[in-house]
Amino acid sequence: MQETTLRQDNTNRIRTLQAARFLFILLIYLSHSVEPLAHSPFDFGGEGGVAFFFVLSGFVLSYGYGPRVSRGEFDGKRFFWKHFWHLYPLHLLFFSVTVALDYRLGVTYDALQIATSLLLVQTWIPSDHTLFVANGVSWFLCDTLFCYIVFAWLYKWLTSIRTSRLAIGMTMLAAVYACLALQVPDRMTNCTLYSNPLLRAIDFSLGIIAYRFYKTCPGIRKLPRLFPYVDVALLLAVYALYQIMCPQIRCSMLFWPVMPLIVVRLATADASEGWATRLLQSKPMSWLGSVSFEIFIAHLLVIRIVQHIVGYDGSEKLAAINLAVSIVSTILVAEALRRWFVKPVTDVINRRLLR
């Protein structure tokens, strides 16, 4: 989802992680589009996909920038603005288009909703009124920017603390989180536990911790055994647990033990052989992974437009057509955005603002 470059100290991308971005974006996509076909919501896909991307971000940033942080060569200000200007123009474009289309339909937003979304501070306010405004997925960008701000500090701390203290601290944090989370009303789950930047920084920190063990544990290379069968089994087990858990736990905490393990297994699988690794390292999968951020930002609007054009009469046949056309259209739109909007705008910003 976030465009995190791996060229700083580690010159090779972890290709399996790059491709996995698309697979988990697809889960998020299905959570917003499959209900008419499945006749039930697929919130697991959205919440699991979001958890994966926060963990992945912590891991990948550590892989790409961690050595610089350790050596004291990390330029936090440049790092933040580089990533901000990669995210913000596309957010601004889709926010503006969505607001304009909604206005035509008689849907308007107040000044607080507009301001918090434009400034990407909406998740700091514990209210659904400001959370999913216009292009609703932009809340994720607010949390992402906060993770960028605290990355260097978290990396230094989490990679230097003793393992025993880290284990005790994480156990205590999980216990306190669970006790407090259970006091949150169901209606407040999204605007607090699911989206608050301070709480999603836990997932991000788990990604940094996962990188720490990926880098330092001698037996880590044995992890990709039975890849991807173990990983699919883990996700299915979590899916089963998801069905019986309360929203306060399943929206985020449920994924804490699983997503770091899956990220590390994906990373170690990059050096292994097997049909799954070859598939993830293939050019089509690498390309799909490279447009995952554009897919994420564009997909809600594309789903709306496709459903308006194709129509929907409640039948499974038309729901399936809508889903298929939406997925293909979103991928094509994402590639067009990357090639003709994101890349040119980023190049201009890099030349004029980030020299």
For each of these PLM feature ranges, what is it?
Residues 14-15, 38-50, 129-143, 183-206, ...:
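Interfacial loop-to-helix transition and helix-capping segments at the boundaries
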Residues 21, 47-50, 54, 65-102, ...:
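Transmembrane alpha-helical segments and their boundary/interface "anchor" motifs
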Residues 161-169, 221-230, 248, 318-321:
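Membrane-interfacial entry segments at the cytosolic side of transmembrane helices
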Residues 26-33, 121-124, 171-183, 232-245, ...:
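Aromatic-anchored segments of alpha-helical transmembrane domains
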Residues 62-69, 101-103, 153-161, 209-218, ...:
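Structural signal for the C-terminal ends of transmembrane alpha-helices
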Residues 1-14:
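Short, Lys/Arg-rich, polar N-terminal cytosolic tail immediately upstream
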Residues 122-177, 337-339:
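Hydrophobic alpha-helical segments with transmembrane-like composition
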Residues 204, 231-343:
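Alpha-helical transmembrane segments of multi-pass integral membrane proteins
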